Amino acid sequence: MEETRAGRYIVRAGSGGQTEDTASGAESVLATLAAVRTRRRSVVCDGPPGSPTDSARHMSDLASLALTAEFGLGCLEAYVRINAGQVLPVVWPPGWNLVLQEIETDEDFKPEDVKAWSHYLCCQTRLAFVGRFVNEGVLSPDQQKKTAVCLISDEGYVFCYVREDTAVYYLARNLMEFARVGLRAVETLHCMRYLTSSLVKRYFRPLLRAWSLGLDTMARFIIRHHGQFMPLTYPPGTELRLCNLRCFENSVEGGHLLRNIKTAFGMRVLGLGTVSLKGENAPFPHLRWPVDLIPIVVAYTGAVYACDVRDDRYIRVGDNLNTFMCLGLNLLFENRRFSGHNGIYDRVPDCPKGRQHR
Protein backbone atom coordinates (compact mmCIF):
# COMPACT_ATOMS: atom_id res chain seq x y z
CA MET A 1 0.00 0.00 0.00
CA GLU A 2 1.58 3.25 -1.15
CA GLU A 3 0.66 6.74 -0.05
CA THR A 4 0.83 9.75 -2.34
CA ARG A 5 0.53 13.22 -0.87
CA ALA A 6 -1.68 15.52 -2.91
CA GLY A 7 -1.97 18.97 -1.45
CA ARG A 8 -3.42 18.80 2.08
CA TYR A 9 -4.40 15.14 2.00
CA ILE A 10 -3.09 11.64 1.37
CA VAL A 11 -4.43 9.49 -1.46
CA ARG A 12 -3.93 5.79 -0.81
CA ALA A 13 -3.13 3.38 -3.62
CA GLY A 14 -4.51 -0.10 -3.10
CA SER A 15 -7.65 -2.17 -3.40
CA GLY A 16 -10.47 0.18 -4.26
CA GLY A 17 -8.29 3.23 -3.57
CA GLN A 18 -6.83 6.05 -5.64
CA THR A 19 -3.63 5.62 -7.63
CA GLU A 20 -0.87 8.13 -8.12
CA ASP A 21 -2.18 8.88 -11.60
CA THR A 22 -5.56 9.88 -10.22
CA ALA A 23 -4.29 11.97 -7.30
CA SER A 24 -4.58 15.21 -9.21
CA GLY A 25 -8.05 14.15 -10.36
CA ALA A 26 -9.13 13.57 -6.77
CA GLU A 27 -7.76 16.98 -5.83
CA SER A 28 -9.75 18.53 -8.67
CA VAL A 29 -12.92 16.77 -7.51
CA LEU A 30 -12.47 18.08 -3.99
CA ALA A 31 -11.87 21.59 -5.26
CA THR A 32 -15.11 21.40 -7.25
CA LEU A 33 -16.98 20.12 -4.20
CA ALA A 34 -15.62 22.95 -2.10
CA ALA A 35 -16.91 25.44 -4.65
CA VAL A 36 -20.34 23.75 -4.66
CA ARG A 37 -20.49 23.89 -0.86
CA THR A 38 -19.57 27.57 -0.91
CA ARG A 39 -22.35 28.36 -3.40
CA ARG A 40 -24.88 26.36 -1.39
CA ARG A 41 -23.97 28.08 1.85
CA SER A 42 -24.22 31.49 0.22
CA VAL A 43 -27.85 30.71 -0.63
CA VAL A 44 -28.71 29.51 2.89
CA CYS A 45 -28.80 32.42 5.34
CA ASP A 46 -27.38 32.04 8.80
CA GLY A 47 -29.83 31.07 11.53
CA PRO A 48 -29.74 29.93 15.13
CA PRO A 49 -28.95 26.27 15.90
CA GLY A 50 -31.95 24.03 15.29
CA SER A 51 -33.62 26.52 12.94
CA PRO A 52 -34.78 25.47 9.43
CA THR A 53 -31.85 27.31 7.85
CA ASP A 54 -29.43 25.57 10.20
CA SER A 55 -30.93 22.20 9.23
CA ALA A 56 -30.65 23.04 5.54
CA ARG A 57 -26.99 23.95 5.98
CA HIS A 58 -26.26 20.60 7.63
CA MET A 59 -28.13 18.77 4.85
CA SER A 60 -25.94 20.62 2.36
CA ASP A 61 -22.84 19.36 4.18
CA LEU A 62 -24.17 15.79 4.20
CA ALA A 63 -25.01 16.05 0.49
CA SER A 64 -21.42 17.12 -0.18
CA LEU A 65 -20.16 14.11 1.78
CA ALA A 66 -22.50 11.84 -0.19
CA LEU A 67 -21.34 13.29 -3.50
CA THR A 68 -17.71 12.77 -2.50
CA ALA A 69 -18.38 9.10 -1.65
CA GLU A 70 -19.55 8.51 -5.23
CA PHE A 71 -16.01 9.22 -6.47
CA GLY A 72 -14.50 6.42 -4.37
CA LEU A 73 -13.01 5.88 -0.95
CA GLY A 74 -9.86 7.82 -1.83
CA CYS A 75 -11.82 11.03 -2.36
CA LEU A 76 -13.97 10.28 0.68
CA GLU A 77 -10.94 9.88 2.95
CA ALA A 78 -9.47 13.10 1.55
CA TYR A 79 -12.73 14.95 2.24
CA VAL A 80 -12.76 13.69 5.82
CA ARG A 81 -9.14 14.75 6.26
CA ILE A 82 -9.86 18.31 5.09
CA ASN A 83 -13.12 18.63 7.07
CA ALA A 84 -12.03 16.80 10.24
CA GLY A 85 -14.03 17.98 13.24
CA GLN A 86 -17.12 18.94 11.25
CA VAL A 87 -20.34 18.03 13.09
CA LEU A 88 -23.32 16.63 11.15
CA PRO A 89 -26.57 16.06 13.10
CA VAL A 90 -28.19 12.63 12.77
CA VAL A 91 -31.94 12.44 12.19
CA TRP A 92 -32.34 9.60 14.74
CA PRO A 93 -31.80 9.25 17.66
CA PRO A 94 -32.37 12.87 18.73
CA GLY A 95 -29.25 14.55 20.05
CA TRP A 96 -26.80 12.36 18.11
CA ASN A 97 -24.22 13.74 15.67
CA LEU A 98 -21.65 12.42 13.22
CA VAL A 99 -18.25 14.02 13.84
CA LEU A 100 -15.90 13.64 10.87
CA GLN A 101 -12.54 12.24 11.89
CA GLU A 102 -9.56 10.36 10.45
CA ILE A 103 -8.73 6.92 11.76
CA GLU A 104 -5.11 8.03 12.25
CA THR A 105 -6.18 10.57 14.89
CA ASP A 106 -8.59 8.29 16.76
CA GLU A 107 -7.52 7.40 20.30
CA ASP A 108 -9.19 3.97 20.46
CA PHE A 109 -9.08 2.46 16.98
CA LYS A 110 -6.44 1.79 14.32
CA PRO A 111 -6.57 1.04 10.57
CA GLU A 112 -6.18 -2.69 11.26
CA ASP A 113 -9.34 -2.54 13.38
CA VAL A 114 -11.32 -1.27 10.39
CA LYS A 115 -9.96 -4.14 8.31
CA ALA A 116 -11.00 -6.61 11.03
CA TRP A 117 -14.54 -5.18 11.11
CA SER A 118 -14.90 -5.82 7.38
CA HIS A 119 -14.57 -9.55 8.11
CA TYR A 120 -17.76 -9.40 10.19
CA LEU A 121 -19.75 -8.86 6.98
CA CYS A 122 -21.14 -11.63 4.81
CA CYS A 123 -19.34 -10.48 1.64
CA GLN A 124 -15.81 -9.20 1.07
CA THR A 125 -15.99 -5.44 1.50
CA ARG A 126 -13.51 -2.62 1.95
CA LEU A 127 -14.53 -0.11 4.61
CA ALA A 128 -13.42 3.48 5.19
CA PHE A 129 -13.49 5.16 8.61
CA VAL A 130 -15.51 8.39 8.38
CA GLY A 131 -15.89 9.48 12.00
CA ARG A 132 -17.66 8.90 15.28
CA PHE A 133 -21.32 9.02 16.26
CA VAL A 134 -21.57 11.11 19.43
CA ASN A 135 -24.50 11.52 21.82
CA GLU A 136 -24.73 15.01 23.33
CA GLY A 137 -27.66 14.20 25.61
CA VAL A 138 -27.77 12.76 29.13
CA LEU A 139 -28.36 9.00 29.27
CA SER A 140 -31.68 7.82 30.69
CA PRO A 141 -31.76 4.92 33.20
CA ASP A 142 -32.49 2.31 30.50
CA GLN A 143 -29.70 3.56 28.20
CA GLN A 144 -26.08 2.44 28.06
CA LYS A 145 -23.11 4.37 26.73
CA LYS A 146 -22.24 3.36 23.18
CA THR A 147 -18.98 3.84 21.30
CA ALA A 148 -20.08 3.99 17.67
CA VAL A 149 -18.14 4.80 14.50
CA CYS A 150 -19.32 5.49 10.96
CA LEU A 151 -18.01 3.30 8.14
CA ILE A 152 -18.63 3.50 4.40
CA SER A 153 -17.92 0.69 1.95
CA ASP A 154 -16.37 0.95 -1.48
CA GLU A 155 -19.89 0.59 -2.92
CA GLY A 156 -21.28 3.44 -0.83
CA TYR A 157 -23.12 1.40 1.82
CA VAL A 158 -23.20 2.98 5.27
CA PHE A 159 -22.30 0.88 8.33
CA CYS A 160 -21.81 1.50 12.03
CA TYR A 161 -19.50 -0.40 14.36
CA VAL A 162 -20.58 -0.44 18.03
CA ARG A 163 -17.79 -1.54 20.36
CA GLU A 164 -20.07 -2.54 23.25
CA ASP A 165 -22.04 -4.86 20.93
CA THR A 166 -18.96 -6.19 19.12
CA ALA A 167 -21.00 -5.84 15.96
CA VAL A 168 -21.24 -3.98 12.66
CA TYR A 169 -24.70 -2.70 11.71
CA TYR A 170 -25.78 -2.10 8.12
CA LEU A 171 -27.46 1.33 8.21
CA ALA A 172 -28.31 2.40 4.67
CA ARG A 173 -27.62 1.89 0.96
CA ASN A 174 -25.99 5.31 0.72
CA LEU A 175 -25.50 8.51 2.66
CA MET A 176 -28.68 10.13 1.35
CA GLU A 177 -30.76 7.22 2.64
CA PHE A 178 -28.83 7.47 5.91
CA ALA A 179 -29.89 11.14 6.10
CA ARG A 180 -33.51 9.90 6.25
CA VAL A 181 -33.19 6.91 8.60
CA GLY A 182 -30.23 7.72 10.86
CA LEU A 183 -29.17 4.99 13.29
CA ARG A 184 -32.50 3.15 13.48
CA ALA A 185 -30.84 -0.12 12.43
CA VAL A 186 -28.71 -0.10 15.60
CA GLU A 187 -31.16 -2.08 17.71
CA THR A 188 -29.37 -1.47 21.01
CA LEU A 189 -29.95 2.29 20.73
CA HIS A 190 -33.72 1.85 20.96
CA CYS A 191 -35.08 2.67 24.40
CA MET A 192 -38.18 4.05 26.09
CA ARG A 193 -36.94 7.64 25.66
CA TYR A 194 -37.12 7.35 21.85
CA LEU A 195 -40.36 5.32 21.72
CA THR A 196 -43.15 7.55 20.43
CA SER A 197 -46.10 5.24 21.20
CA SER A 198 -47.46 6.13 24.63
CA LEU A 199 -49.91 3.21 24.35
CA VAL A 200 -47.10 0.64 24.09
CA LYS A 201 -45.28 2.29 27.00
CA ARG A 202 -48.37 2.17 29.20
CA TYR A 203 -49.01 -1.52 28.61
CA PHE A 204 -45.38 -2.61 28.96
CA ARG A 205 -44.53 -0.70 32.15
CA PRO A 206 -46.17 -3.26 34.53
CA LEU A 207 -44.41 -6.09 32.68
CA LEU A 208 -41.04 -4.34 32.96
CA ARG A 209 -41.66 -3.66 36.64
CA ALA A 210 -42.41 -7.34 37.25
CA TRP A 211 -39.24 -8.35 35.43
CA SER A 212 -37.15 -6.01 37.57
CA LEU A 213 -38.35 -7.94 40.66
CA GLY A 214 -37.10 -11.29 39.42
CA LEU A 215 -37.98 -14.32 37.31
CA ASP A 216 -40.49 -15.73 39.82
CA THR A 217 -42.36 -12.42 40.03
CA MET A 218 -42.44 -12.31 36.24
CA ALA A 219 -43.89 -15.84 36.07
CA ARG A 220 -46.65 -14.95 38.54
CA PHE A 221 -47.43 -11.76 36.58
CA ILE A 222 -47.92 -13.72 33.35
CA ILE A 223 -50.22 -16.27 35.04
CA ARG A 224 -52.22 -13.52 36.78
CA HIS A 225 -52.69 -11.57 33.52
CA HIS A 226 -53.17 -14.60 31.26
CA GLY A 227 -55.05 -13.63 28.10
CA GLN A 228 -54.30 -9.89 28.36
CA PHE A 229 -53.37 -8.20 25.07
CA MET A 230 -50.42 -5.81 24.76
CA PRO A 231 -49.90 -3.72 21.58
CA LEU A 232 -46.64 -4.13 19.66
CA THR A 233 -44.78 -1.54 17.62
CA TYR A 234 -44.19 -3.98 14.73
CA PRO A 235 -45.86 -5.40 12.71
CA PRO A 236 -48.45 -2.61 12.86
CA GLY A 237 -51.70 -3.68 14.47
CA THR A 238 -50.33 -6.82 16.13
CA GLU A 239 -50.63 -7.62 19.83
CA LEU A 240 -48.88 -9.87 22.32
CA ARG A 241 -51.34 -12.14 24.15
CA LEU A 242 -49.85 -13.03 27.55
CA CYS A 243 -49.60 -16.80 28.08
CA ASN A 244 -47.15 -19.18 29.78
CA LEU A 245 -47.15 -21.31 26.58
CA ARG A 246 -48.08 -24.64 28.19
CA CYS A 247 -50.29 -25.19 25.15
CA PHE A 248 -47.33 -24.69 22.81
CA GLU A 249 -45.03 -26.92 24.85
CA ASN A 250 -47.55 -29.76 24.58
CA SER A 251 -48.18 -29.32 20.86
CA VAL A 252 -46.85 -31.78 18.29
CA GLU A 253 -45.39 -29.30 15.79
CA GLY A 254 -43.47 -26.91 17.98
CA GLY A 255 -43.28 -28.27 21.49
CA HIS A 256 -39.73 -29.52 21.01
CA LEU A 257 -38.64 -25.94 20.22
CA LEU A 258 -39.62 -24.73 23.66
CA ARG A 259 -38.10 -27.78 25.30
CA ASN A 260 -34.86 -27.21 23.39
CA ILE A 261 -34.55 -23.57 24.39
CA LYS A 262 -35.25 -24.49 28.01
CA THR A 263 -32.45 -27.03 27.80
CA ALA A 264 -30.10 -24.44 26.27
CA PHE A 265 -30.77 -21.96 29.10
CA GLY A 266 -30.96 -24.46 31.95
CA MET A 267 -34.78 -24.42 32.18
CA ARG A 268 -34.71 -20.75 33.19
CA VAL A 269 -37.02 -19.68 30.37
CA LEU A 270 -40.52 -18.23 30.67
CA GLY A 271 -43.30 -18.35 28.14
CA LEU A 272 -44.32 -14.74 27.53
CA GLY A 273 -47.19 -15.12 25.09
CA THR A 274 -48.17 -15.39 21.44
CA VAL A 275 -48.43 -12.95 18.53
CA SER A 276 -50.78 -13.64 15.63
CA LEU A 277 -49.38 -12.29 12.37
CA LYS A 278 -52.91 -12.40 10.95
CA GLY A 279 -54.17 -10.14 13.70
CA GLU A 280 -56.56 -12.81 15.00
CA ASN A 281 -56.11 -12.96 18.76
CA ALA A 282 -58.51 -15.76 19.65
CA PRO A 283 -57.26 -18.40 22.12
CA PHE A 284 -55.52 -21.41 20.57
CA PRO A 285 -58.38 -23.62 19.25
CA HIS A 286 -56.53 -25.86 16.77
CA LEU A 287 -55.21 -29.40 16.91
CA ARG A 288 -52.16 -28.29 14.92
CA TRP A 289 -50.15 -25.18 15.81
CA PRO A 290 -50.62 -22.42 13.16
CA VAL A 291 -47.36 -21.26 11.56
CA ASP A 292 -48.50 -17.62 11.77
CA LEU A 293 -49.04 -17.78 15.53
CA ILE A 294 -45.64 -16.81 16.96
CA PRO A 295 -44.78 -17.97 20.52
CA ILE A 296 -42.59 -15.52 22.47
CA VAL A 297 -40.31 -16.54 25.35
CA VAL A 298 -37.92 -14.64 27.63
CA ALA A 299 -34.72 -16.19 29.02
CA TYR A 300 -33.23 -15.53 32.44
CA THR A 301 -30.67 -13.28 30.69
CA GLY A 302 -33.52 -10.97 29.67
CA ALA A 303 -33.21 -11.78 25.96
CA VAL A 304 -36.51 -12.32 24.13
CA TYR A 305 -36.95 -15.01 21.47
CA ALA A 306 -39.64 -15.86 18.93
CA CYS A 307 -40.25 -19.51 18.01
CA ASP A 308 -40.48 -19.86 14.23
CA VAL A 309 -42.46 -23.07 13.69
CA ARG A 310 -42.10 -22.85 9.92
CA ASP A 311 -38.27 -22.94 10.01
CA ASP A 312 -38.14 -25.02 13.20
CA ARG A 313 -35.93 -22.60 15.11
CA TYR A 314 -36.11 -19.74 17.58
CA ILE A 315 -34.92 -16.24 16.72
CA ARG A 316 -33.76 -13.41 18.99
CA VAL A 317 -36.15 -10.46 18.79
CA GLY A 318 -34.58 -8.38 21.56
CA ASP A 319 -31.55 -8.37 23.85
CA ASN A 320 -33.94 -7.41 26.65
CA LEU A 321 -37.59 -6.56 27.24
CA ASN A 322 -36.94 -2.85 26.61
CA THR A 323 -35.62 -3.59 23.15
CA PHE A 324 -38.53 -5.94 22.44
CA MET A 325 -40.94 -3.22 23.56
CA CYS A 326 -39.38 -0.75 21.11
CA LEU A 327 -38.85 -3.08 18.13
CA GLY A 328 -41.70 -5.58 18.39
CA LEU A 329 -41.04 -8.47 15.98
CA ASN A 330 -38.86 -6.40 13.66
CA LEU A 331 -35.84 -8.70 14.12
CA LEU A 332 -37.94 -11.71 13.14
CA PHE A 333 -38.19 -10.30 9.62
CA GLU A 334 -35.04 -8.19 9.30
CA ASN A 335 -31.60 -8.37 10.89
CA ARG A 336 -28.86 -5.86 10.12
CA ARG A 337 -26.42 -6.84 12.85
CA PHE A 338 -23.23 -8.62 11.83
CA SER A 339 -21.64 -9.97 14.99
CA GLY A 340 -18.07 -11.09 15.42
CA HIS A 341 -18.63 -13.73 18.08
CA ASN A 342 -22.28 -14.67 18.54
CA GLY A 343 -25.64 -14.50 16.83
CA ILE A 344 -26.48 -18.21 16.56
CA TYR A 345 -30.08 -17.36 17.49
CA ASP A 346 -30.28 -14.40 15.11
CA ARG A 347 -32.07 -14.28 11.81
CA VAL A 348 -29.52 -14.53 8.99
CA PRO A 349 -28.29 -10.92 8.50
CA ASP A 350 -29.58 -9.19 5.39
CA CYS A 351 -26.82 -8.93 2.81
CA PRO A 352 -26.37 -5.31 1.62
CA LYS A 353 -25.62 -6.66 -1.86
CA GLY A 354 -28.88 -8.61 -1.98
CA ARG A 355 -27.29 -12.05 -1.94
CA GLN A 356 -28.76 -15.05 -0.15
CA HIS A 357 -26.61 -16.47 2.67
CA ARG A 358 -27.56 -19.46 4.80
UniProtKB/Swiss-Prot annotation:
A GO cellular component entry from the record: host cell viral assembly compartment
Report the subcellular localization. Answer: Virion tegument
| Keyword terms, alphabetized | Virion, Virion tegument
**The keyword Zinc is assigned to this record:** no
- Please give the Pfam families that the UniProt record associates with this protein: US22
Q: So which domain of life are we looking at? A: Viruses
Report the InterPro entries cross-referenced here: US22-like
Family membership, please give it.
Belongs to the herpesviridae US22 family.
- This chain belongs to which protein, by name? Tegument protein UL24
Q: What's the source species for this entry?
A: Human cytomegalovirus (strain Merlin) (HHV-5)
Encoding gene per record: UL24
